[in-house]
Amino acid sequence: MDEYQALLEKALADEISTVRLYLAAMAKAPPGDVAILLEVNADETDHIALIAGLLSRLTGEPVD
């Protein structure tokens, strides 16, 4: 389980980094692209919630 937990923790960190990347892209994007980036970013935040839920279930602790 330690390897599984480590993989989930890395996946969570990567998803958070991806959200930050999309936010930075939105700051520079032409106005017409922002809606698309918002949609993609919403998917990423859903992924964060799902992975955090898996980690919480695995450890019995809330994920901050």
Indicate where each model-derived feature is located.
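Non-heme di-metal
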Residues: M1-D64
